[in-house]
Amino acid sequence: MKKILLLLVLIVAVLNFGKTIVTTINPYYLIVSQLLGDTASVKLLVPPGANPHLFSLKPSDAKTLEEADLIVANGLGLEPYLEKYREKTVFVSDFIPALLLIDDNPHIWLDPFFLKYYIVPGLYQVLIEKFPEKQSEIKQKAEEIVSGLDTVIRDSFKALLPYTGKTVVMAHPSFTYFFKEFGLELITLSSGHEHSTSFSTIKEILRKKEQIVALFREPQQPAEILSSLEKELRMKSFVLDPLGVNGEKTIVELLRKNLSVIQEALK
């Protein structure tokens, strides 16, 4: 009887490890990998250094999606190439109440409150349905992530509270949700990846010159994009990383790294 039970356990383990979860962007790869451990094969579609707004499928990418048992995607227009794979795709943005979303801004993974209350719990539910025999382990990992997020939230409030009501300028609106949560106004040079800076935006920046406390860009953007503003505002720009191009191992580590950059910029 014991041999039969052991055989059944081994069969279930083999079947599960044979399952493939594909995540479109690195932040969800970090979360799903931490939740599942070695329970399944977790693959990343868009490399961290690539621009997910401009990503298009190569034949090898299409093959990866075809072979996936589950696809974890952001939604909010970030992955238009997933239309034919919708039946096996979970869009993380569906976990978040529509009233909390800002227009079509897709950068929900950078909001630690969204992660704590919607994204991690939502992915936990999806994964325990896929791997019910691993519920205990997945729950433990989810609790570890939430505990880390609590620390990030606490540290962010402590660091940013003195700057409530101040203004931050970014080249791209990736940290819109984050700065809103902690009471700072964000002005972006463009509303998306393919829009140039409008004259009205420049006027707003100059009008709020005395309120601006930091300038940021992303790793994929050239330093020159903020050079004129650096001169005008007499302020150095810093790099915030929305995707984890420097090899962060967890989503909490990614948020912590960005918080440390923000703190450095505010000194």
UniProtKB/Swiss-Prot annotation:
- This protein's major location comes to periplasm
Superkingdom, natural source: Bacteria
Residues in the signal sequence? 1-15
| Annotated a divalent metal cation binding sites | H53, H107, H172
Short name of one Pfam family for this protein?
Answer: ZnuA
Q: Which UniProt keywords apply?
A: Metal-binding, Periplasm, Signal, Transport
**What GO cellular component is one of the record's annotations?**
periplasmic space
Which GO-annotated molecular functions does the record name?
metal ion binding
Task: Tell me where in or outside the cell this protein is found.
Answer: Periplasm
* Any Gene Ontology biological process: metal ion transport
- TM ranges: none
Instruction: Tell me the function of this protein.
Output: Part of an ATP-binding cassette (ABC) transport system involved in metal import. Binds a metal with high affinity and specificity and delivers it to the membrane permease for translocation into the cytoplasm.
Q: Which family does it belong to?
A: Belongs to the bacterial solute-binding protein 9 family.
Please state what the protein is called: Putative metal-binding protein TM_0123
Q: Which organism is it from?
A: Thermotoga maritima (strain ATCC 43589 / DSM 3109 / JCM 10099 / NBRC 100826 / MSB8)
